[in-house]
Design a protein with these regions (language model features):
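Generic hydrophobic-segment detector
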Residues: 22-23, 43, 99
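Residues that form generic nucleotide/phosphate-binding pockets
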Residues: 4-7, 92, 101
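A common structural junction motif
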Residues: 96-100, 139-141
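Non-catalytic DNA-recognition/assembly elements of restriction-modification systems
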Residues: 1-15, 20-34, 117, 121-145
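Intrinsically disordered, low-complexity segments enriched in small/polar residues
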Residues: 26, 67-68, 99
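A short beta-sheet element
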Residues: 32-94, 103-115
Length: 145
């Protein structure tokens, strides 16, 4: 993964700076180890990225963050070195079941250095778009939507 993606953990934030609801004063989603954990006044990242949860029982889960957001130390921001479709990157990273690389401790966690060593095939961009299109078409069939 490390030859295709740059992975950087976010920054610590005091719990007192988090709001449970999105307001005019706290408009930015804050990503933790299992997706959005609240909203904050100031972002620490901007763009369109896969986010990997790196701490807790659900570590290895993949979310997508778009726009301005805050990533905590329990979330890994994934940037693509190659010209990759972000939706494909999210699907692909999810399919890797990254939780299998978690440390087996009381509080499971992923080390960026460990998952960076995972070898992966990368299809051409056109194939990535085709995969995403097929997934979008089939997803409602398995989610009963």
């Amino acid at each position: 993964l490390g030859s295709v993606f740059s992975m950087q953990a976010g920054k610590n934030i005091k719990a007192s700076l988090l709001s449970d609801i999105q307001t005019e004063n706290t408009p930015y989603p804050c990503f933790g180890g299992n997706g959005v954990r609240g909203f904050v006044a100031k972002p620490n990242a901007s763009g369109d990225f896969p986010i990997i949860g790196r701490q807790g029982a659900l570590c290895g889960n993949v979310r997508r963050a778009s726009g301005d957001f805050y990533a905590t130390e329990h979330a890994v921001i994934v940037s693509c070195f190659l010209n990759a479709d972000i939706a494909w990157a999210c699907l692909f990273l999810s399919a890797l079941n990254l939780n299998q690389y978690a440390t087996a401790t009381a509080q499971p966690g992923l080390a960026v250095s460990k998952i960076s060593e995972v070898l992966i095939p990368i299809p051409p961009l056109a194939e990535q778009h085709r995969i995403v299109g097929r997934f979008v078409m089939l997803e409602p069939l398995v989610t009963n939507q």
